[in-house]
Structure formats: C-alpha cells, structure tokens
A protein has these predicted regions:
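Long, His/Glu/Asp-enriched segments that create or flank divalent metal/ion-associated functional microenvironments
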Residues: 651-674, 678-714
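Catalytic cores of secreted or luminal carbohydrate-active enzymes
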Residues: 112, 126-146, 708-725
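Solvent-exposed helix-loop boundary motif
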Residues: 37-133, 150-177, 185-250, 281, ...
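Primarily short, surface-exposed interaction patches in extracytoplasmic proteins
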Residues: 246-320, 325, 331-660, 699-700, ...
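Positively charged n-region of N-terminal signal peptides that target proteins for export
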Residues: 2, 13-19
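Sec/Tat signal peptide C-region and signal peptidase I cleavage site
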Residues: 32-36
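Bacterial N-terminal signal peptides
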Residues: 21-31
Length: 785
C-alpha cells in the first residue's frame, strides 16, 4: 500500500505538470493565433502588418461589400450595414467588430459568410486561404483593433502615369503607391480597384496587370480608399518596317496637338475632305441645315483658295447659327417648359431669345454666364417700374412670340423654375458651367472623383441666398399686383407675380452630414465665400480667374464635342480624376486661348472649323480605321433632333410650319419649348432623342442611332408625304416628266438630271457613285434569282 503522504505528493506533482502543460498549450495557441505573420500578396509584395483602415477596408471596398447594392445601402443587408464606399472608418469598425471572433479567427462570422461556409446572399467573395482571407484572418487574430487615422491618404500615385505599349497583344504592370498622413509610403496595388474606360483598347488582369488589345488610347481609373487616380494607356498601330510618317499641312495649334498624339500612336489622319463634303458638314454643324444644289455648284466652281474660310465666316454670322447654339445652351442650362410659369411655352421662348440675342452679337461666355448665374428679377429698377414691365411682358407673350425679355440684363428664368430646389440648381450649375457631375455626392462621396458630401453641400450653399417670392422692398407692390391679377377674368388672368432676389441675411443652408453643423458656401476645389454679400458673384469671379481648372476648359470642350461628335473629355460634363482628357495638351491650349481672347466663343469655333483636323474626310485609312477618340478622321454622327427635322425639310425641298410652337417661317431649330404642340414635330423630336431638359447631366437627350429612327425614315407616313410633295415632285413636274416616268418613256438624260438635283440636295455631291453603290448592295444584285 502506498504511503498516503507520498500519494498526495505524487498527485500534486502530476497535477502541477498537467497545469503547466495546459498553460503552455494555451500560450502556444495564443501565440500562434496572435503573432503577426507576413502575408504574400499578388505581385510579390509582402505585407508585414495588417492595418484595418489601410488593408481590411480596402479589401471590403475591392470586393464590393460596401457598395450601394450590398451592405453599403442605406438599410444594409442581413442586419449588417457599412458606410457607402467606406467613407466612415469608425462606423465600419463598430459594425465589423460584432462579426469577428478574436479567440478563433477562422470561426469569425464575417469570414464564414464571405467564404460561403455559411449562407450568404452576396455569394462567395473570396476563398479560404486566399490572400484576402489571410488579410482578414491576420487582423482578427491580432485583436481586430483600429488605429484611427492610419488610412488617411495624402497622395496616390500610379506608376507609370502613362503606359506606352509597343502594339496590341502585350502586357504591362501598373503599380500604385500611397503616401499616408504619417509620412509612410506603401505599395497598395493589390488593394486597389481598377477600371478600364475602353476595354476595346485594353483589358485588365489581376492586380493592375494590363493587356493591350487593339490600337488606340484609353485610361485606367484606379481607386483606393476613396482616392482616385488615372493612368493613360497608349496602344500604337503596328506598322511595317521602314514606315515613315507622312508630311501634311498643319494649319494651327489644334493640328499640332492632334498631330503630336497621332504620331505616338502611329496613326495617320485621313486626307482633307472634298469641297462637297466640307460644305455639307459645315452647313449642318453651324446652322443646322444642308446647302441648296445651287450653293453646292457655286462653291465647287469657286477657285478662291480662301473660299472655305470665307464660307465659315459667312455661316458663323448667319442668324441660324445663334439659334442653333441657343437651342444647345437651352439644353445645357435646363430650359424645361414644364418647370416654368404660364404661359410656359412663351417663357421657354424668352429663355431661348435671351441666349440667341447674346450669341448673335458674339457676347463672351463670361458675360452670358454672369447674366445667368447672378440673375435677379428687378435689377436696379424700382418695384413699381418692374411690375409695369412684367405686365407688358405678360401681355406681349400672350399675343405672340416676340417680347422684350432678351433686352433684360439677366436670365432670371433660370432661378424662377418651379419645383427646382437648392440641390438641383447646384447640380445644374456645376454641370453647365464647370463640366462637373456632383449628383452622386448628394448621398455619398463620388466613387471616381475627389468630391465629398460636404463639398456638395458647401457648393449648394453658394446659392442659398437666392429666393423667389417678394423681397421686403417690393413686397407691397407685388401683393397689390397679385390682388389685381386675382380679380381678372379666368381666361385673361396672369400667373402670380414673383421676383427672384438675394436675401443675404436669411439664407437657406445645408448642414454637414456628419456633424449636422452649418457649412459655409464654398466653390468646388476653391475658397470659402463671404456670406456678407451675394455668394454667386464671388463664385463667378473665382470661375473667371485665368487659372481656374474648370470654367474655360469645360466650355471649349463643349464646342469641340459639337463639331466632332465627342469631347476631348467625354462625356462633356464629366470632368473628373477618373475620366482624363484624351489629349490634355489640346484641351489646355484651347482653354488658354479662350481665356486670353476674353472667352470669345466665335474665335474658338473659327479655329476649329479652319483646322485640318476638322476638315478631314470621314473615309478611314488602314491606320485610323479603329480610331474613336484621337480625331484622325471625321466621325459620322447623329444630329440634334431639331436639326434632323430642318435637314430633312431642306433636302426634300419642303417648308414645314410650326405655327403653334414658333413664329411663321421659323425652323425647328428655333422652336424653344420642350412641350411641342405640333404632333408631327413632337413625334420626330421623341424618336431622335430631343432633350427633355429635366436632368442636370447631358445624358438627358440622345443623339445615338436606334432602330426606331431607321424605321421612321423608312416607313413614316409624314416622311413619305414630304418626299412625294417636295423637290422630287417639282423636278418631275417639269415638262410632264411624271407622266412619262409612269409610262416608262422618260429620257435617260432627264432622269439623270432629276437624280443629280436630288443628290445635290440630300448628299451635297454628284449621285453616280451612290447610285452604283445602291445597286450592288441591293437584294437583286447580291442574290441569284
């Protein structure tokens, strides 16, 4: 029998050994679970220490987990809500912290869901053991802590900034370096989101790998923790050994900038277009019509070497040129008939006339924008004088289309639209005058630009002083006038009189979305503004500074887009970090010239139209057949809806009256209203994408081709009626041609003359090539029958 004291000692010894072993096991387990381990990332990068803000939240964003359709939505998903696009690290850490297990990282609810080990509506976001998984696991195992402010980026750099491929079918690696507020610099390439703008030119692989596909240029937008950079991609055309770039005429700095880019891409521009091609294009682009057969013959026969420049000057001074641009600017500035007071269509006409008159006398863009952006109703007039002028205006508007509104110094209708709030007018102003889309910042930080919700609200507050109603000075006169109007017969009653005025002392304010404190008015990327005076005027002065990065560049880009079918920045109202210009040297040269010339619109137009670049043929050569953005040739493009109507009528030789929508003898391009009464005109406008002018961005209208447009031109009864009753009927009526055509006895020479006249009217050139083309492309030719 064992001695009891010895037994007790033995038991105690064994117990202590087991306890020690257990303690060691726990310690080893803890060490295994918490000791930082190097993580191998794509591209051979070693991550020594995982940071919540820099790495974990970057993976969350890269996987799309904090997007608007997932956990970043306002209500979240499955009870789990993150800040949209990761704008709030503190909120995100609190939400994620509830779904991790620091004692057993692999058993964390977050990882089980993301790897689909547990049911997940968002599917599998990454696999167990992947580098993304290891980033999460390592951070959880370390305790799931957050170092506040560690992810504040002060600079994001793409290396290289321009990727120059040797040709299609090769690869290159982008590297992204982030500099943080604490001074550290890190290769964050695996944590970035990459998006290629044109995947025809290049496609993306994993982790910033880019493969060239076809000749051209594009950009890759790189996003990391809400910061955006873009890298330019150039893929030159393959050329034969010994290729020598040809010489051709350089007319002005436009041609030099375009030539410089084309040489980098081994792209040769098309030849200069023929006289017929030039005349038709310039007439459509400047006055929204086509030349008559007589004009074509006279221009082709003219031997003056300056005839193109003379024709350009002639057309730029044509009243229809101002009307065309007044229609374009009506779309840009939001001349929406439905948002105006009665008589709505006439007020749209006033808006259009105000723009047209200034364009006719070639007022500078700065002057035009000043009249819009800083507009008030009374100006310097006394209330009684203004009330009298308003009554005269209302009476003239009811009687016809002509009023004296265009003589007013400012366009107060821009601010007098109904149901347009502070946010909407700020979005419209940013897009129209700065070329910047701020709409998405109403709810969250812009995913591909630098703008935040605070930037958005600070800019909106610039316009918070503008009121519509009755100012203290004019209140008595306005109330008396409205009482008088109320007593008028119903069918003669004018709308309630309201003035647009500035109320410096009691502005509307949007608060900071985080602190709920008032935000001072501020220009986008510019200074805070003094609230003691009209902040709109201060904004305008900032816009007109020569070094302003938006105002001049945005408008010359719109001019370029009008004449080429696409902007140097495209879309034209999307100047952003993630959407760089295709040719920044060209854009900067145009903008600098525009500012130096006092914002002279016609000067820029004249330069563009006289350039070889604009006058190139639409026929491609073997080097530029794939070009879509470097202006190596003229790009075929659709016309504005009103121009389609006018061109069709001019080509067919018919006059269409729009008596319900425009004065007698006016064209569709002079119809100001968006609510059109003429049924045929309304139908054509709808089919050809006429802008409703209800949206702040240029996406509201469309000039893209569609099946409905093709069917309209082929089968619409109104089109067929104009064909039968227009120029063709007139030509066939000469000498009984119609009867002899029906009898099959018409002479060949007579029929050729008819074809020639119709082709000159429609295409601006001799028809023979087109007749042969039509024959060999017919079913009768291509099929055996």
């Amino acid at each position: 029998m064992t001695n009891p004291p010895l037994l007790c000692s033995y038991v105690m010894e064994q117990t202590m050994k087991k306890s020690l072993l257990f303690t060691l096991a726990i310690g080893l387990a803890f060490a295994t679970n918490s000791q930082a381990q190097s993580i191998s990332l794509p591209g051979g990068i070693k991550l020594e220490e995982v940071d919540f803000e820099r790495h974990v939240m970057a993976v969350v964003g890269k996987m799309g987990c904090n997007g608007g359709v997932c956990h970043g939505s306002f209500q979240g998903r499955g009870g789990f809500r993150l800040s949209l696009f990761g704008y709030d690290f503190e909120m995100d850490h609190e939400a994620i912290d509830e779904r991790i297990d620091t004692d057993d990282a692999d058993d964390s609810y977050l990882l089980l869901k993301a790897t689909l080990q547990d049911d997940h509506g968002g599917g599998e976001r990454f696999k167990v053991g992947s580098w993304q998984y290891r980033v999460f696991r390592e951070w959880i195992a370390k305790g799931g802590e957050r170092k506040a402010g560690s992810g504040r980026v002060v600079e994001l750099e793409a290396v290289p900034k321009v990727v120059r491929f040797r040709g299609p079918g090769t690869s290159a690696q982008l590297k992204v370096m982030a500099t943080f507020e604490d001074g550290t610099k890190e290769n964050v390439t695996p944590f970035c989101d990459f998006r290629v703008k044109d995947d025809y030119v290049a496609e993306l692989g994993d982790g910033g790998l880019i493969r060239s596909r076809y000749p051209g240029d594009t950009a890759v937008a790189i996003s990391y923790l809400g910061h955006v950079r873009a890298a330019k991609i150039l893929v030159p055309t393959k050329v034969q050994p010994g290729f020598i770039y040809p010489k051709y005429e350089i007319t002005n700095y436009i041609d030099r900038a375009v030539d410089s880019r084309l040489r980098q891409l081994n792209v040769v521009p098309s030849v200069v277009g023929s006289d017929e091609e030039f005349l038709r294009r310039v007439t459509i682009d400047t006055i929204g019509s086509v030349p008559t057969p007589d004009e074509v013959r006279q221009f082709v026969a003219d031997r003056n070497p300056q005839k193109r420049s003379k024709k350009i000057d002639e057309l730029l001074n044509n009243p229809l040129h101002a009307a065309l641009w007044a229609t374009k600017l009506s779309e840009i500035t939001g001349n929406d008939t439905d948002s105006l007071e009665q008589p709505r269509e006439k007020r749209s006409r006033m808006w259009h006339d105000w723009l047209r008159v200034r364009l006719e006398r070639n007022a500078g863009w700065d002057e035009i924008v000043r009249g819009i952006l800083t507009a008030t109703s009374r100006g310097d007039r006394e209330p009684a004088e203004w009330v009298q002028a308003e009554n005269q205006l209302e009476t003239a508007a009811r009687a016809g289309f002509d009023t004296d509104y265009s003589e007013r110094s400012s366009l107060d209708l821009y601010w007098a639209r109904r149901n347009v709030n502070l946010e909407q007018v700020s979005e419209q102003s940013a897009a129209a005058f700065l070329g910047v889309r701020l709409q998405c910042c109403r709810c969250h930080k812009h995913p591909y630009d630098k703008w935040t919700q605070s930037d958005y609200r600070s800019f909106a507050n610039v316009f918070g002083q503008v009121k519509r109603g009755a100012s203290a000075v004019a209140q008595g006169a306005i109330q008396a006038e409205n009482q008088r109007r109320q007593g008028m017969p119903q069918n003669q009653r004018f709308a309630q009189l309201r003035e647009v005025f500035v109320d410096v002392g009691n502005p509307q304010r949007l608060n900071d979305p985080k602190t709920n404190q008032p935000l001072l008015p501020k220009a986008p990327g510019g200074p805070e503004l003094d609230t003691g005076s009209d902040t709109r005027t201060q904004l305008l002065e900032w816009m007109l500074e020569p070094e302003n990065p938006y105002f001049g560049r945005a408008f010359v880009n719109r001019v370029w887009e009008h004449y080429f079918g696409r902007g140097i920045v495209h879309p034209v109202d999307d100047f952003s970090v993630g959407n760089p210009p295709t040719n920044p040297e060209l854009l900067n040269a145009l903008a600098d010239d525009f500012v130096k010339r006092g914002f002279d619109i016609r000067h820029i137009e004249r330069l563009v139209l006289n350039s070889r670049t604009w006058q190139t043929s639409a026929v491609p050569n073997e080097t530029n057949i794939y070009d879509k953005s470097n202006f190596a040739r003229s790009y075929p493009r659709r016309m504005m809806a009103p121009v389609v109507v006018d061109v069709l009528n001019a080509a067919l030789g018919v006059e269409q009256q729009f008596t319900a929508d425009a004065a007698e003898g006016e064209r569709a391009i002079q119809v100001a209203a968006t609510r059109v009464r003429d049924g045929n005109l309304r139908n054509t406008f709808r089919i050809f994408g006429h802008s409703s002018r209800k949206s702040a961005c240029d996406c509201d209208g469309s000039e893209d081709p569609s099946l409905s447009q093709t069917l309209y031109m082929m089968t619409d009864g109104f089109v067929m009626q104009r064909i039968r009753n227009g120029r063709l009927r007139q030509l066939l009526a000469v000498g009984g041609r119609m009867q002899r055509l029906q009898n099959g006895t018409i002479e060949h020479d007579e029929l050729a003359e008819v074809l020639r006249e119709m082709s000159l009217a429609i295409f601006g050139r001799n028809p023979m090539v087109d007749v042969v083309w039509a024959m060999i492309n017919s079913r009768e030719f291509i099929l055996n029958h």
